[in-house]
Amino acid sequence: MAALLAAGAMAVGGVTPAAAAGGLLPHPGPDGLVWVEDMVGDGGVASGGAWDRLPTVLTVACEGGGAAHVTMDSQGYRVADFTVDCPTGTPGTGSVTLDPGVVRTGSFTIGVDASDDTVRWALTVTQPE
């Protein structure tokens, strides 16, 4: 499991401008597998359609004070695990890029554990070609 986490390059932290119309992250476009536009508190998503021959990028933005702990599982393996600081007033972002083959073909799940029920977050999963 540690080898899978080490296979991806992770960049967590930073601040990003809010997306159009007050969203935390813009729509991911044609490379997008998942877009969770706006959630508050704990949550997550399950999806299918991942392909193991492309890199996978998971990006989370949040605000409201506190933090969001993010995990991603693919076919029974934990492939990402990171925490994003969620400042008040300006969104914080965290992102992980997983090499081809780390996310396996088929379904995956992402969990977001917010430190407070008022933490607002959004996420995208893309597989750029």
Regions found by a protein language model. Give the residues of each.
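Short, surface-exposed beta-strand/strand-loop-strand elements in extracellular ectodomains
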Residues: 66-82, 123-126
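Transition segment at domain starts
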Residues: 16-49, 128
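Solvent-exposed serine/threonine-rich low-complexity stretches and specific carbohydrate-binding patches
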Residues: 31-38, 78-89
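Secretory targeting and sorting signals
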Residues: 1-20
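N-terminal, post-signal-peptide region of Sec/Tat-exported proteins
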Residues: 51-73
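Noncatalytic modules at the cell exterior or secretory-pathway interfaces
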Residues: 53-59, 99-125, 129
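Beta-sandwich interaction modules
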Residues: 44-49, 87-105, 126-128
